[in-house]
């Protein structure tokens, strides 16, 4: 019989700076060797629970505690952060903030250096764990020079080398491309089988986590545990949608088809879903949708054979890249990390100049436009809003671009007020920006661009790190902007966003435009998925596993029907 390794008994925690508890009456037992997924909307208490487990609460973040919590048999109120660190290893969402060493090898060895382990033993351990996480060929590289997935593996190895009993992963998929995310979940599964450690995963992307099995899913909201059950049982219920958490798309498809999920087996295992009514009902539902071809607007932006390299003797980051963007389109730009997506946006904005090729704006040569002149036509919103914000107050921040352009004060007041209404920020117009959530700050940065009345808006990962509720709010807001005539390009790793909200996808790979097609066509093309480090949509995988006659048409049907359900 497995022993408890983490227990919370009627546990509540309230930060000193807050008027109400963040965790309320938590009753929870996690056993040795379990793999547990913790999900919930932003502010649900997930991170606070994790900080109680790894000792940051109460050692770093102080507050009032009621009840008891023990980790590896130690009361967290009586145990130092140092002592708990031997039992709990944490891999942070921001891996750059976790690096210590100048090389991968040094970073992995850091914990052993602190423990004064003999060098021969240390080298042996570094070699062992670097092989497990497939970094043994990169030991002399700087961690900062690696891809997002490789950086995460460095952090994993640095934690694993300490042989902690409990491994805590904080949003391990947040900054990874789809294939790297899938590889990360497989690696976590391999590590758990190898070490028999207890694994806790905090993550928004439920469907992506379930590509490997988990023992339990804990659903949190408003500081309490709403549900604690197996994945199979949870997916039969409406708990996820009630709590504003995205359920797997194939589960939504079965609901649309009127399938009784209580009669479905292996609901948490995509390739093994079965039930007497599943195939006939899905077949009946998946008739080809009647679709009206969208009429393209006039040409807005055209790139002709554009090439760029950062180093004169280095590889081309963009190579003979050609594409045409039309007025009113909403397009996703996808591809693995380092594919050239960000370079493409920098060239369009004029931050860097290509060595060859043409850029045309409404048929006119764009190369002679200054950055300021381009900024009047193109808005660029960075992934992290904190890197764009200059002022303390919302109204001042949104007005800044107009002030710098010497726009008359009366016109500034009128335009800023109008944009704040459009962005849903008017009630907060006199608030300090520091009081806003991450998603609200993102809206402020978008508002500060929109007030300049650009025709094209480029967003880098517009929904990164947001729960499903805030994700939906952001994407609904962007759709409304698109309906107002703003052309939108989104750089994203989120295949759901690409599938559900855009009608065209540009796939970038090694600096080239690998494909320009509908999102459904992209995410059902096996060769394209492999080449660009994408991930086949679960809808297509589900349809193939069921044996539906035309999985592609089924996927198209779902996307069209789902849009109709959500937007009418």
From Swiss-Prot:
Membrane topology designation: Peripheral membrane protein
The answer to whether keyword Plastid applies is: no
Q: For this protein, what is the EC number?
A: 7.-.-.-
Residues annotated as binding ATP 1 are 40-47
Q: Does the keyword Ligase apply?
A: no
> Where in the cell?
Cell membrane
Q: Which domain of life is it from?
A: Bacteria
The molecular function GO annotations come to:
ATP binding; ATP hydrolysis activity; ATPase-coupled transmembrane transporter activity
According to the entry, every stretch annotated as the ABC transporter domain falls at: 6-247, 301-535
**Binding-site residues, ATP 2:** 335-342
Entry keywords, A to Z:
ATP-binding, Cell membrane, Membrane, Nucleotide-binding, Repeat, Translocase, Transport
Q: Top EC class per UniProt?
A: translocase
Q: Do you know which InterPro entries this protein is assigned to?
A: AAA+_ATPase, ABC_Co_transporter, ABC_transporter-like_ATP-bd, ABC_transporter-like_CS, ABC_transpr_CbiO/EcfA_su, ECF_ABC_transporter_ATP-bd, P-loop_NTPase
According to the UniProt record, which cysteines are disulfide-bonded? none
Q: Name one GO cellular component term.
A: ATP-binding cassette (ABC) transporter complex
Record-linked NCBIfam families: PRK13648.1 (NF010167)
Which protein family is it in? Answer: Belongs to the ABC transporter superfamily.
**Biological role stated in the UniProt entry:** Probably part of an ABC transporter complex. Responsible for energy coupling to the transport system.
- The name under which this protein is listed is Putative ABC transporter ATP-binding protein EF_2153
Q: Which organism is it from?
A: Enterococcus faecalis (strain ATCC 700802 / V583)
């Amino acid at each position: 019989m497995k022993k408890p390794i983490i227990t919370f008994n009627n546990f509540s925690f309230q930060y000193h700076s807050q008027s109400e508890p963040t965790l309320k009456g938590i009753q929870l037992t996690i056993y040795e060797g379990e793999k547990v997924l913790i999900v919930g909307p932003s502010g649900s208490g997930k991170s606070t629970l994790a900080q109680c487990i790894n000792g940051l609460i109460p050692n770093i973040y102080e507050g009032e505690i009621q009840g008891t919590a023990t980790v590896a048999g130690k009361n967290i109120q009586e145990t130092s952060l140092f002592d708990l660190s031997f039992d709990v290893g944490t891999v942070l969402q921001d891996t750059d903030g976790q690096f210590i060493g100048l090389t991968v090898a040094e970073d992995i060895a850091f914990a052993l250096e602190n423990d004064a382990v003999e060098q021969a033993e240390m080298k042996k351990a570094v070699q062992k764990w670097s092989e497990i996480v497939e970094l043994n060929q990169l030991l002399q590289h700087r961690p900062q020079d690696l891809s997002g997935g490789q950086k995460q593996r460095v952090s994993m190895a640095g934690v694993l080398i300490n042989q902690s009993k409990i491994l805590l992963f904080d949003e391990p998929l947040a900054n990874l491309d789809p294939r790297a995310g899938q590889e990360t979940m497989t690696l976590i599964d391999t590590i758990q089988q190898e070490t028999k450690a207890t694994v806790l995963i905090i993550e928004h992307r439920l469907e992506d986590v379930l590509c490997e099995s988990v023992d339990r899913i804990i659903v949190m909201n408003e500081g309490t545990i709403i549900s604690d059950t197996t994945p199979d049982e949870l997916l039969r219920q409406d708990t996820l949608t009630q709590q504003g958490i995205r359920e797997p798309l194939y589960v939504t498809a079965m609901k649309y088809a009127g399938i009784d999920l209580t009669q479905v087996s292996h609901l948490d295992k995509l390739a093994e879903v079965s039930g007497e009514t599943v195939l006939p009902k899905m077949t009946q539902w998946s008739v080809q949708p009647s679709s009206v071809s969208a009429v393209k607007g006039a040409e807005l932006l055209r790139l002709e054979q554009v090439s760029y390299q950062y180093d004169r003797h280095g590889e081309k980051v963009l190579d003979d890249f050609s594409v045409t963007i039309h007025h009113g389109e909403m397009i996703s730009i996808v591809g693995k990390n380092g594919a050239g997506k960000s370079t493409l946006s920098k060239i369009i904005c004029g931050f860097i100049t290509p060595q060859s090729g043409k850029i045309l704006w409404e048929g006119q040569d764009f190369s002679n436009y200054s950055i300021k002149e381009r900024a009047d036509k193109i808005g660029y919103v960075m992934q992290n809003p904190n890197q764009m914000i200059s002022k303390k107050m919302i109204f001042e921040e949104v007005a800044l671009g107009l002030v710098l352009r010497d726009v008359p004060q009366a016109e500034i007041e009128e335009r800023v007020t109008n944009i704040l209404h459009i962005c849903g920020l008017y009630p907060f117009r006199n608030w300090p920006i520091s009081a806003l959530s991450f998603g609200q700050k993102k809206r402020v940065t978008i508002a500060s661009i929109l007030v300049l009345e650009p025709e094209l808006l480029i967003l880098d990962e517009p929904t990164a790190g947001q729960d499903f509720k805030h994700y939906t709010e952001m994407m609904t807001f962007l759709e409304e902007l698109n309906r107002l005539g703003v052309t939108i390009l989104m750089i994203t790793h989120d295949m759901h966003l690409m599938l559900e909200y855009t009608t065209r996808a540009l796939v970038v790979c090694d600096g080239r435009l690998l494909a320009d097609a509908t999102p459904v066509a992209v995410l059902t093309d096996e060769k394209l998925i492999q080449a660009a480090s994408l991930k086949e949509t679960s809808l297509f995988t589900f349809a193939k596993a069921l044996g539906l006659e035309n999985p592609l048409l089924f996927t198209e049907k779902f996307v069209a029907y789902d849009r109709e359900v959500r937007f009418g």
